Curated annotation (Swiss-Prot):
GO molecular function terms attached to this record: mRNA binding; rRNA binding; structural constituent of ribosome
Protein name: Small ribosomal subunit protein uS3
Gene3D superfamilies with a match to the protein in the record: 3.30.300.20, Ribosomal protein S3, C-terminal domain
SUBUNIT field: Part of the 30S ribosomal subunit. Forms a tight complex with proteins S10 and S14.
Family the UniProt entry places it in: Belongs to the universal ribosomal protein uS3 family.
Top-level taxon of origin: Bacteria
InterPro entries named among the record's database cross-references: KH_dom, KH_dom-like_a/b, KH_dom_type_2, KH_sf_prok-type, Ribosomal_S3_C_sf, Ribosomal_uS3_bac-typ, Ribosomal_uS3_C, Ribosomal_uS3_CS
Ribosomal protein among keywords: yes
The KH type-2 domain, residue ranges: 39-107
Residue stretches of biased makeup (Basic and acidic residues): 219-240
Chain residue ranges for the region called Disordered: 211-263
Job of this protein: Binds the lower part of the 30S subunit head. Binds mRNA in the 70S ribosome, positioning it for translation.
Entry-linked CDD domains: KH-II_30S_S3
Amino acid sequence: MGQKIHPTGFRLAVTRNWTSRWFADDKAFGTMLAEDIRVREYLKKKLKSASVGRVIIERPAKNARITVYSARPGVVIGKRGEDIENLKADLQRLMGVPVHVNIEEIRKPETDAQLIADSISQQLEKRIMFRRAMKRAMQNAMRLGAQGIKIMSSGRLNGIEIARTEWYREGRVPLHTLKANIDYGTSEAHTTYGVIGIKVWVYKGDMLANGELPPEAATPREEERRPRRAPRGDRPDGARTGRPGGRGRGPRKADAAPAPEGE
């Protein structure tokens, strides 16, 4: 079932944390949850061009603190901070409490699963071939340090009549391993043929229970790896001519000497 379950929900309280961090009683829980959903939908629409990877919402003591992880923080802040002030006013109107907004920069957007999925969906909406978009994203992620990546696209790919699913994988993506740091993201491409769904899994290495990465295991040196098969001319005589009980053929028998003339 590791292939089907949501990778983030599977690892909650083990190596991953919640994106909504607050406590509420039974009466207020539904209202606050609906507010979080509205805030996330608003930020997704408002900051569509800012490459937002994830949003964390915290509610300490009748306040709200929202952390936005973006690959383009300058777009969120705007000139002289005007855009972020307007954003803060809109969020306060949505939530009804004072809101503090923090902007965090994503250092490697090529290895962020949500940003990869959004990038592929934008390319599909511009009529770029889905295979080219998927393979280009995989190459960029592996080049910048990802240990494995898997991308899946579903829908009327290239405008075909019958919807299908195609996926590509490079490297390792251990979905059953709880300590594996799996980043997961989804997106939708609204094309003229219909909606195409994109799912992205990025494996960034193993993670300890406290959220820290373990020391990297030493990779085997080149001379310690399994040697390749030797060329035919460099093999020992036994391997070339065959031995009793082996798979090779036995030594070739010498041709009979020609009979002397006159007999």
